[in-house]
Amino acid sequence: MKFFATILSFALITASLSAQEDTKLPKPDADGWMTLFNGKDLAGWDGDPKVWRVKDGYISGAIEKLEGGNTFLVFKKPFSNFVLEAECVLVGRKGNSGIQYRSKQSERGANKWVVKGYQADFGNGLWGKLYEEGGRGVLAFTYKDKAPEIKKDDGWNTYRITAKGSKVTQEINGTVTIELDDQDEKKAAKEGIIALQYHSPGDFEVRFKNIRIKLLEAK
């Protein structure tokens, strides 16, 4: 029995690694940026089809009632050192969402779209904060003097995340909201996937567009 369990575990790990390897990145533009969302469909992404869809050139996450806890739209390609940008908006200023980076995918019961790791948080009172989903909780609060000026309540906001070595920086609309040098040798993440969060219990809509990434040298 243990032998078959080991074989099954190996097969699942192999399938997961193959899925990551099969996610092909587009060619970078002249400035080194690669587009992760083509504006037409969810190619390269994986998530609950009851929650995620593409409308009018943006990704929409919406459901009346979400069962099984938070769910995520996952880009199954690990990244280490990079600058990541995405435009986002919470329709009607309702709900809670975030952008996962250097994260890991896991499962919780029937919910296979569970992600743990660094999250560039956003929602009422949450914009700009660094939260570790499924881990240490809040790692860095938004600079208090920046909180009133960083977001547009009813418009698109540009989130910019820079991760290089042990240091991460988050910006909203050009304003730095947090800077962290994560020196926790056991828990700090150096590499991982990118994902978009839809927070339980639902009953709101979050939108994302213009998602792009630029890879950085380690040093």
Language model features with spans:
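Bacterial N-terminal signal peptides
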Residues: 5-15
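Carbohydrate-interacting regions of secretory-pathway proteins
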Residues: 19-219
